[in-house]
Amino acid sequence: MQKQIGIILKSASLGIACLCCICCSENKTQDFQIIRFDKDLYRYLTENAPDSILKDHTDFLDVFGEGVLSIGKSDSTGFFSRLKEYFSEPTLMGIYKDEQEKFTDMTDINKELSKGLHIFLQQFPQIKPPKVYMHVSGFFQNVVVTDDILSLSADKYLGSDYPVYQDYFYEFQRELMSCDRIVPDYLSGFMMANLPFFGNEDVLLDRILYEGKLRYILSKLLPKRKVWEYIGYDEEQYEWCDLHQSQIWNTIIENHHLFTPDYFSTSQYLKDAPHTAYLPADAPGKVGIWLGFRIISAYMEQKPKTTWIELMENTDYQEILKQSKYKPQ
């Protein structure tokens, strides 16, 4: 089991145009219930069950084996032996057992996730509805996305105070490893894969407005959540940004960070970290994402008839900023 934080396997496609009508029809009736691959694999590993117990998950098993565990596809020689060997590590199996005990009733998660996916796919009918899975990886990817699969590694959502996490993750990372992050992370991963970034990665304005677009859409997919949850903040972190809006903005402008292509300075405002560089020590991390969300929210207030497709396709980031009429308080 390696010490590494989650990443997202992204699909570069926005969907296949010829499937548009099919997808629109499916969106009206499809029930996005999470397929518990994690449960079947646990039974396979602990009950000496035959390989056939996983036969219903062949498509995902290939993604899981090749893309997550790097042990090859399910039809490769020795695949199931390698699978058992990977999960033979005692600490990992202890985590797996805890995951199975924690996630017994998925009713609320299924309900919230299904509603969010339905809303998203109604707004982006060209995107293919996914099969939704749950798996355990040993702290690898948080979310895995392919053209037709969406899966989340549940062993990374056992609670910020889960003892094993202290050996593998920093405190600021553990704060986002609770079960209430499952649905936002499913949806965020799916959006990032299907709505990729277009712009200059070195320019802060481009990056924060893209992130702001995703957070704005997430806020509409999960309308009952607290506003700080869309960013991955707690209430105190969000309020700090609110109280220091002018300081955040002035720091960015005075340091010429908003428009100047500079990957290093841009990344400081976006990365998960205990705090954001250039700002006081009590500033939370990823302040750029908070700012992008604020600007896009202001823009959509000014342009309420803008569809989500139009929002995502608009890459004139300076014009978006201008039309948002954003003014820090």
Model-based region annotation:
Residues 84-238, 313:
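Acidic/His-rich structured neighborhood in mature extracellular/periplasmic domains
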Residues 260-329:
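C-terminal soluble interaction/assembly domains
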Residues 2-13:
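Bacterial N-terminal signal peptides that target proteins for export
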Residues 20-23:
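C-terminal motif of bacterial Sec signal peptides marking the signal peptidase cleavage site
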Residues 40-44, 119, 123-126, 220-224, ...:
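Structured segments of extracytoplasmic/periplasmic soluble domains
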Residues 115, 119, 212, 216, ...:
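Extracytoplasmic/secreted proteins, especially bacterial periplasmic and envelope-associated proteins
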Residues 215-276:
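Acidic/His/Gly-enriched intrinsically disordered linker/tail segments
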Residues 25-90:
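N-terminal mature-domain "stem" immediately C-terminal to a signal peptide or N-terminal signal-anchor/transmembrane
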